[in-house]
């Protein structure tokens, strides 16, 4: 579920905000500030009254109602925070940067399940967990660098891997490539690559939307939906290029260790991409 509060939030809270810009909670707040976000910005940090010039609250229960919550706190604390924010603070979008979920342990997977049940019950979006975030021209909710030039006619990048997204951004920035949006879906507990493509297809604006989509996929949860919406976007004039990681046995293990993903066979991926009209790339440099 992709809500308007994820794409165009009028207010954002960073839970676990920090004055240390080398921590995710500090880096993402810095990027929001330097990116010129014009909405209401709040921080939650029990040890500070102000973080990077932003008013800080001791607990999530103390903040005003907010559209988007970014969580940079230990995984074990996330389910209760999400419940409070969704139930009491009307939050309709969550970005969870934290690792330590289903990509690591069974206990972590249980935490993810609790979070998913909560966000679905309250009709909220969830990016992550275990991701670098999301950005568009409205807000730079990522903890990584670089921040590329953002333009409605730029490229849409959807990546299962935050590290790969950063690598692609670093390469693209040196070439002057502009972006419309960057989606780091991480463990993709609610929103995966297929969901983003579906949203882009169903809301496609031929006059204003980007026509170039770059995908880095670690698992394909719903091949039929990916095929349908990729094919539809291509018929509308879009170009889609993609890497499917983990096609080899060693690559499958790497993909699984990163996101808890189960990789698809190489022959199935090849057939799917060919049928959809997706240009398959075999390296990040090629993409």
Predicted regions and their residues:
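Catalytic-core regions of core metabolic enzymes
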Residues: 1-286
